[in-house]
């Protein structure tokens, strides 16, 4: 479903942000 795709995208974005922040 669209909502599921949206949740997975937002979750992936959050993880990427965490990695960027942690790495920085």
From Swiss-Prot:
The answer to whether UniProt assigns keyword Repressor to this entry is no
| Entry keyword annotation includes Ribosomal protein | no
Name its cellular compartments.
Plastid, Chloroplast thylakoid membrane
Q: Name one GO biological process term.
A: photosynthesis
What's its membrane topology? Peripheral membrane protein
Positions of region (Disordered): 1-24
Looking up InterPro entries in the UniProt record yields: PSAN
- List UniProt keywords, sorted A-Z: Chloroplast, Membrane, Photosynthesis, Photosystem I, Plastid, Thylakoid
Q: Which GO terms describe its cellular component?
A: chloroplast thylakoid membrane; photosystem I
What family does this chain come from, according to its entry? Answer: Belongs to the psaN family.
Explain the purpose of this protein. May function in mediating the binding of the antenna complexes to the PSI reaction center and core antenna.
Instruction: Supply the name of the protein.
Output: Photosystem I reaction center subunit N
Task: Give the species this sequence originates from.
Answer: Cucumis sativus
Question: What gene is it encoded by?
Answer: PSAN
